[in-house]
Structure formats: structure tokens, C-alpha cells
A protein has these predicted regions:
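A compositional/biophysical signature of low hydrophobicity enriched in polar/charged and small residues
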Residues: 1-80
Length: 80
């Protein structure tokens, strides 16, 4: 099992509604264990788990980055 913390930056605009809807959509993705709204450089942090590194990459690039409002992501792969 591979796990990563994905730091997510959202676009500007109706921030509160955008953050809430993006958080809800990300939480529905298979492999996403938890999603937190945070303050600071990033807006959301998602804990993502997958059986392989390739599957983890697919979830992040094909699913999370496709959510409306997501501008950038940075992934921190957990080593142990």
C-alpha cells in the first residue's frame, strides 16, 4: 500500500463555496481516505491510499486534478 498527502491549491473566486464543493468531490474519489480544509499556502490536504505507485499517480492526476477549482497539487509520499 502506498500513501500520500496531497496538498491542493484552489482557484480564486467564491472561495468558501469552491472549497466546500471541491472537498466534497475529492472525498468521493476511491482511494481518498480523508480530506481536510487548511489555512496557509494550500487550501486542502487529502490523504490518498493506493495499492501501487502507478495507481496513486492515476488518482492524483486523473481524478483530483480534474476537480473544478483545483489549480495545483503537490504530493508528499509517506515513506513509513
Amino acid at each position: 500500500m502506498v500513501m500520500a498527502l496531497v496538498l491542493i491549491k484552489l482557484g480564486t473566486g467564491e472561495y468558501l463555496s469552491l472549497a466546500k464543493s471541491a472537498k466534497e468531490e475529492i472525498a468521493k474519489i476511491k482511494g481518498v481516505a480523508k480530506v481536510y480544509a487548511v489555512f496557509g499556502r494550500y487550501d486542502l490536504v487529502a490523504q490518498v491510499e493506493a495499492p501501487t505507485l502507478e495507481e496513486l499517480s492515476r488518482i492524483i492526476t486523473d481524478k483530483i486534478r480534474a476537480i473544478a477549482g483545483v489549480v495545483t497539487t503537490e504530493s508528499l509520499i509517506v515513506g513509513f
